[in-house]
UniProtKB/Swiss-Prot annotation:
Comp. bias regions, Basic and acidic residues: 36-51
Protein name (Swiss-Prot/TrEMBL): UPF0370 protein ESA_00777
Transmembrane feature ranges: 4-24
Location (main, coarse): membrane
Region feature Disordered, mapped onto this chain: 36-62
Pfam families assigned to the protein according to its UniProt record, in alphabetical order: UPF0370 (PF13980)
């Protein structure tokens, strides 16, 4: 178990490499063209800044 104390970072790198390979493999399976054709409509953006930002910080144009 002494080697685990010295080389724990190798195990972490192997784990991260495995996660990265699985992510790449899963992303290759995604059909982006099919998703873009069937994507849901987004609701309109609602901005509530107009309710509290009454003061005008910009200089007035003459």
């Amino acid at each position: 178990m002494e080697w685990l104390g010295k080389y724990w970072w190798v195990l972490v790198l192997v784990f991260l490499l495995g996660v990265l390979l699985n992510v790449i493999k899963d992303l290759k399976r995604v059909d982006h063209k099919k998703f873009m054709d069937n994507r849901p409509e987004l609701p309109p953006h609602r901005d509530f800044n107009d309710k509290w930002d009454d003061e005008d910080d910009w200089p007035k144009k003459k």
